[in-house]
Amino acid sequence: FITYISAIGGQAFGVWLLGLSVNNFSLVAGINACFFLVSASILFLGKSKLSLSLSSADGEILKNEKLSIKEQFLTIYRNLRLVFLKGGQKNFGFMIFAVLLINALGGALGSIYNIFFLSHSLLDFSYTEALFISQFCALLAIIISSLTGNDYFGKQSLPRLMMWVTVGLSLVGLANLFNQVVLGLLFICSTLYVSAKVQPKISALLLKNLAPEVLARTSNFLGLLFTLSIPVGTACFSLVAVWNIQLTWMLFVGLSLLAIFLTVINLKNDI
């Protein structure tokens, strides 16, 4: 929760600074880099206080684990496959690919809107105001979702949640393709509200079906895949958006439909 509040404050500061500097993106990027540098310096100076002591049992496990990188990846793959099989998902590959595709599409929305609002207005707001409103609404939807874990969507299975998210992403793309900016923003908020339920579902599956000694490694590897999919999606869509924003939304809709197809396959095996 504190992370989301900090994000809202950071977005407000960034938008204010962007307006103050008359859209000087280089200045904002430089200040952003300085903040990251300060954060890294604080972590480096306090790293001795962040060390985690291991129990003797964990120490023995680490000493006895002398697997190669390939063997470790195979072990993690088998663990993940077993988790999703126990969760009722037979098409493990399709499931992971669908989640990564959803993550890439969702992560790319911010960069697309940064370019989209240069040529499209949101209710006659300025560029910086439109950016702030869209980002604030997105974060607010995620915060509300995190505070309502037992609602209708929180009780749905992972494939059903993914189906709702993929349909929402396709509606976002279609709305913006036809220049319905306000409608697209409403679809974004709805989609992010549902998508915020996906990660807890996956974490619950891992906690329920993995032994403690392999939980951290498997969870971190899955988190790494999700994290890497975001810059890939951002880079690809940003390159297309600079060239043609309409083509970007068409590509976004096409990949969303592919994600829907993959989730339909997983939904059929939701046993």
PLM segments and residue spans:
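Transmembrane alpha-helix termini and helix-breaking/packing motifs in multi-pass membrane transporters
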Residues: 8-31, 119-120, 232-249
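C-terminal transmembrane helical hairpin of 12-TM major facilitator-type secondary transporters
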Residues: 158-199
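Helix-to-loop junctions at the C-terminal end of transmembrane segments
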Residues: 18, 144-157, 241-242
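Helix-loop junctions on the cytosolic side of multi-pass membrane transporters
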Residues: 29-62, 265-271
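A single, central transmembrane helix in multi-pass transporters
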Residues: 22-27, 75-144
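Substrate-agnostic recognition of the 12-TM MFS/MFS-like secondary transporter fold
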Residues: 1-18, 99-110, 146, 187-239
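Juxtamembrane intracellular "pre-TM" segments in multi-pass secondary transporters
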Residues: 49-95
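Alpha-helical transmembrane segments of multi-pass secondary-active solute transporters
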Residues: 27-32, 130-131, 161, 218, ...
